[in-house]
Amino acid sequence: MKAIIFLFAVLTVVAIIIPIISGEPNAGPLAASIDLKQIMEKVKPDLLKMLDDIKAKIQQG
């Protein structure tokens, strides 16, 4: 159950961050004040590893 909740939390964060990275005009004031692309390039490998870990936990049951 914890894995499912964690998965939704990660997906929510990704859903918020992806539009900001892609430079959507409605990304909000954050996109203007912070260079999130640079931050995401640093965080992306960790996020991908986290998602792989979640998949493994779900498959294990």
Curated annotation (Swiss-Prot):
Source domain of life: Eukaryota
Signal peptide: 1-23
In-chain residues carrying the UniProt-annotated modification Glutamine amide: Q60
GO cellular component: extracellular region
Tissues expressing the protein: Expressed by the venom gland.
Propeptide positions: 24-33
Residue ranges the record marks as coiled coil: none
Gene Ontology molecular functions: toxin activity
Localization per record: Secreted
Miscellaneous: Negative results: does not exhibit hemolytic and cytotoxic activities on HEK293 cells.
UniProt function note: Toxin that causes a rapid and irreversible paralysis when intrathoracically injected into insects (blowflies). Does not cause spontaneous nocifensive behaviors by intraplantar injection in mice.
Family listed: Belongs to the formicidae venom clade 2 family.
Protein name: Myrmicitoxin(1)-Pm5a
Organism: Pogonomyrmex maricopa (Maricopa harvester ant)
